[in-house]
Amino acid sequence: MKINEFIANIPPEIISGENISISSNVFRKIFSFSQLSPNDIFYYLNFGNNYNALHIAKKEFNAKEVYGIHGRKQFLGNHEEGIQNPAINIINKKINEVDLSKATVILYWLTDINQSSDLVLKFEKELKRDARVVTLFSPLGMVLPSRVDFPFILSKHPFYYATNIREQIQAIYGKSCVDFTTSWMLAEKYVKEMEIENTYSRFTIILLSMILWINSWNLKVTCEEYIPPPVESYEGILRMFFNIDLKDMFVRRDTEKT
């Protein structure tokens, strides 16, 4: 199975993050990382199955106001308690229809490339100074993060932008190139911080580290000049034992230098 076929078979709600239930402890880490406080007005964009995040933001971190945004009405049936809870505001609108001008902390689960540029424009237009946007894995667009504890990324408004991908990688990872060891360590940290079950952790680390490195290779920001032996080995493991073929991900030929 080619990687695009593998992804196509994943339900879209999983890709968007809507149908993923995240451990409450992960949200506690995120809120501590973002320094959520009683002075903050918190918005969770596309909160999906994670009403628990809204509850924790209000009850444990005492956020001044809490808003859960979701554009799909059928999804809200899972959150009748929240809809009836006056301390938590549920808004059934698409993100682009919601006024974010009073938000001081925003959590956006996944950075959809197709929405990224539109969201950055919306944030630039509506957010007040010092508003914090928390994303996972990467900032929005070419925004330079204000703070990083991978996979948690915080960007503070007004945003500053990288002039090239290496500058952004330096800000996220602390170095201007990505080697396979770094990719593996980041994948391990993601699995640990997101508290992924041990049953799936090894597979997740292998696949994620490969995707991280291959994407860096295609962008010509790997530290290696050629495809290293571990990448070739894990490509074979994924193909042989998991029936996942990553060949189509390689846009560059292995003879091209970074």
What are the functions of these language-model segments?
Residues I172-T258:
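Rossmann-like AdoMet/SAM-dependent catalytic core
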Residues M1-P38, K73-S101, E235, F250, T258:
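S-adenosyl-L-methionine
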Residues L100-I113, S117:
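Short SAM/SAH-binding signature in class I
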Residues E65-H70:
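Conserved SAM-binding motif I beta-strand of class I
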Residues P38-G48:
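Conserved class I S-adenosyl-L-methionine
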Residues I113-K175, D179:
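C-terminal substrate-binding/active-site "lid" region of AdoMet-derived donor-dependent transferases
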Residues N49-A63:
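Conserved SAM-binding loop of SAM-dependent methyltransferases across substrates and taxa
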